[in-house]
Amino acid sequence: MQERKYNPKDIESKWQQFWTEHKSFEPFDIDIATSDSMKKKYILSMFPYPSGAIHMGHVRNYCIGDALARNYRQNGYNVLHPMGWDAFGMPAENAAIKHKTHPKTWTYSNIDTMRKELATLGLSFSKEREFATSDAIYTRFEQEFFIKMWERGLIYRKEAYLNWCPKDKTILANEQVIEGKCWRCDTPVVQKQMFQYYIKITDYADELLECLNKLEGHWPSQVLSMQRNWIGKSKGLSFTFDFSVDSLQKLGNGKVKLEVFTTRPDTIYGVTYCAVAPEHPIVQQLIENKSLDESVIKSIEAIKNTTARARAMSEKVGFDLGVYVIHPLTQEKLPVWVANFVLMDYGSGAVMSVPMHDERDFEFAKTYALPFKCVLTKEIDGEEPTQEICAAYEEGFLINSGEFSGMSSSQAKERIIAHFENASIGKGITNYRLRDWGVSRQRYWGAPIPMVHCQSCGIVPEKIENLPITLPEDVVIDGEGNPLDKHLVWKDCLCPKCGKKAQRESDTMDTFIQSSWYFLRYSTPRKLWEKQAFDKESLTYWLNVDEYIGGIEHAILHLLYARFWTKVLRDLGYIEIDEPFANLLTQGMVLKDGAKMSKSKGNIVNPNELIAHYGADTARLFVLFAAPPTRELEWNDKAVEGAHRFLKRLWERAEHIESCTQKPHINHKTLQKNEQYARQKVYEALQKSNEIFSKKQSGYAFNTLIAASMEAFNALNEQENPLVWTEGYFVLLHILEPIVPHICWELSEQYFRRCNFAPLSVDKDALTKESVIYAITINGKKRAEVEMPLGLSKEEIIIQAKESVPKWLEGVEILKEIIVPNKLVNLVVK
């Protein structure tokens, strides 16, 4: 008998080479799959940015997806499980400056490195469909989409105050500003007025919101809630305040009014002041008309240079503008303030302030000693609260509100909106928190925006036949501004419309555009990539993505944009689906010492070192066993060693297997008890595997599947029947192949010619129990365990229970006898 020494390095390199040479994981052509009536599964883990090295978060993400893909292949599905690279972005330019290299060179070198590192994990990717988003052919179709959206009116260009990163020298979307800092480099963000291109994601706000209902039960509720809140649909009243006569003189404009939007028209009688954003036009009018002190102007400019999120986090700051508006119902004069909590890009950039019933307004009014007025009570005919601020910011019943007093908030909202509409001084409208998506970036390493600036024609899209507009490679990247803006040879071009001299747009696209449609591109075979963005037949066959795996941090960035882009491409006629991802799994972070792994904390675990020391199967087993996929995973060196020991034992004990090409037939009733128990545990593990993969129990709780397999293996070790051993391995290698593929392929090849990597059914006879273990407790404390035959009467169960604990029943009175069928007997005594 050959020596059973487990050598993962040799086994894993052998099978990785085999899978590559035989293209083992390429999906079948759809005509073959369709003719064979094969069901499809599209399994996709979010693709990585090629930073240069994989980390444990990558390992966990891709092992989860790989386990799903391998299981579905075993069960006869045609599986698409692709991989690619989210390759554009600022880090490549930063590296170019630091290492004196070209961003393209740095990026593609990193891709080569990470591709090799991921290959050592034995991931079953479709290598034929791999691409990087920086590939020219990918950019070509992305630019085509941009042009089609421009022609459809879904893209426009305007000047606005934008989030500007002084270090990276680029615009950031609101979502890319984290606590007032750049999401990439952590530099404090300032506001800068610039032209940029916007995509009208707001045109799809209602559909994006409504379609979330279709995803209930298929996406995590937290992600759905985050997207609903980000879209932020609210209904309310839009109306205008007239300025007082003396204020109009200060403004230098006799016709200006102050437009506001409120979701709480029921509190309109509680307005004691109005607040405007520092960018509001009336502020500029007051400055131009020299109606503000220089010190106030400087303070307002300082607020302008603060990001929206930083304003929200900071203390409430404002300045009295010295002008007044007239309350449309009470005719009271109300002061107008500029305030840091009012944003120009939400609503009209002005708000009515009700300090008694709004926490933010209250804080501001308290700071600047502005008046309060209570117009709501909790109960009908309730007394006006004596405390400084009403306990309810919520709805209630109106007081001090003229003809609307006594009404509930909901009734008053409708009546007040109707009153304003009948008087033609306002109207009920729907508003959204969602803003149009600013997609211009002042950087080199991105997809060029395919627009041309012509003095005669204005802004003109490039001709489709001239695409792709590629990046020049002879650029100087020194960290100062946009290298494309300085490359005059590249910028100079002819106008696609009139043929005169013109200049290319030097801004590049936000990299979230690239990740908004990559999952659609995978559906098309490589041989068709040059001809079209998508092959419709292939796309119809593969989409939706059946399982999409990635971090919850992408909930309101990538996932919202991907849903939006899918709907746009549908409306442009490229695709026919409404939603891209049928199911979403958000995996938890990998922690060490209770914190997320990072270089700054010094708690990094290098996957390459882990694989070199223990093997890929050990790494895979650990990350899938240590915690359910959706939970955080705490690194544990001892657990890694334990995973390796299990695989070593699995390898060594294979000496008991007899070669065969089909599962042995065993008469369960003729076996000894320990043999029956081993078979029972083996088929319980198979049943658990089937349930986890088919019913997605607990978000694919692989840890319970692995635990059941280990329990079955231990039970096999307690018996010596070679047929039971052989059947046990036949089934266990089938169960574990998605988790630890290398060792399973090697053992299966040696003993079963890989015939066990096909659908297996549970032997119900093996699961039939003739007896059950009862825990016997006295006053809730476990005192014994008793094996009892199934089918006993309650009286018989109690008799056996009492016989098992005689010393605990001496000198006591039994007050109550409780039976939990097939589990427990509790005797309550005194």
Curated annotation (Swiss-Prot):
SUPFAM superfamilies: Anticodon-binding domain of a subclass of class I aminoacyl-tRNA synthetases, Nucleotidylyl transferase, ValRS/IleRS/LeuRS editing domain. The keyword DNA repair does not apply. A motif ('HIGH' region) lies at residues 48-58. A motif ('KMSKS' region) lies at residues 596-600. It is found in: Cytoplasm. GO terms for molecular function: aminoacyl-tRNA deacylase activity; ATP binding; leucine-tRNA ligase activity. ATP binds at residue 599. It comes from the Bacteria. It holds the Pfam family tRNA-synt_1_2. One of its GO terms (cellular component) is cytosol. Keywords: Aminoacyl-tRNA synthetase, ATP-binding, Cytoplasm, Ligase, Nucleotide-binding, Protein biosynthesis. HAMAP family: Leu_tRNA_synth_B. This is Leucine--tRNA ligase. It comes from Helicobacter hepaticus (strain ATCC 51449 / 3B1).
